Regions:
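Non-transmembrane, aqueous-exposed alpha-helical and coiled segments at domain scale
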Residues: 1-205
Length: 205
């Protein structure tokens, strides 16, 4: 069984991932695991958006889990150690916003499925009538949607001088980065033009 080739205690969190499901654990987290052998800054804070059951087993195992790789020659096992923290978003959204606003975090990635973007797929626009969006606009300090969380974190980075952020949509959406940028910018403009302007120059999607 292959094990991490780095000191777990030396790893910092440079990535926050929203939607810690099987796809991310088998792909994005593995790429980060490969990188950590050379650069300890890119540990992951993995976030479950819907249920604590997605993160409870990982938390009990210090973030470690085993990936099975199958090919015609057989099956190999690998322990992945890149997930250094776990969070349940509805449990403490303010803490999650602070985590994404940490200046040591440079990347937020997402696998929240198409429905998780609270948008109209036909137009690519934010659905302002969506219950989660309405909640977030009324309670911006305690967002529940991915768009609201991103906007809150970007606003916190703006206010604290934490710097720019790279936001990477890993879901199967046409023009996913451009769509997500439009959603977050639209939401931000509804709240404050200053935030929307800051996002235009300090966030990459």
């Amino acid at each position: 069984v292959a094990r991490p080739r780095y000191d777990l205690a030396s790893i910092g969190v440079g990535i926050v991932h929203l939607g810690l499901g099987a796809f991310h654990r088998a792909h994005g987290a593995v790429y980060a695991d490969d990188l950590l052998a050379r650069d300890p800054r890119w540990g992951i804070c993995g976030v479950s958006m819907k249920t604590p059951r997605a993160v409870a087993p990982l938390a009990a195992q210090d973030g470690l889990y085993t990936l099975l790789l199958k090919d015609p020659s057989g099956t190999t096992a690998r322990v992945v150690g890149s997930v250094r923290e776990t969070m349940f978003a509805p449990g403490d959204p303010r803490a999650l916003v602070r985590r994404m606003a940490d200046p040591r975090v440079h990347v937020v990635t997402l696998t929240v499925t198409e429905k998780g973007y609270c948008h109209d797929p036909a137009t690519g626009r934010l659905d302002l009538a969506h219950p989660d969006v309405r909640h977030d606009l009324a309670h911006p300090g305690e967002p529940v949607s991915a768009v609201g969380l991103l906007a809150a974190a970007l606003d916190e980075r703006r206010r604290t001088g934490a710097g720019a952020l790279n936001v990477v949509c890993c879901d199967n959406l046409p023009h996913n980065g451009r769509v997500l940028e439009g959603l977050v910018s639209s939401y931000a403009a509804t709240r404050t033009p200053e935030l929307a302007n800051w996002i235009a120059t300090h966030a990459a999607f």
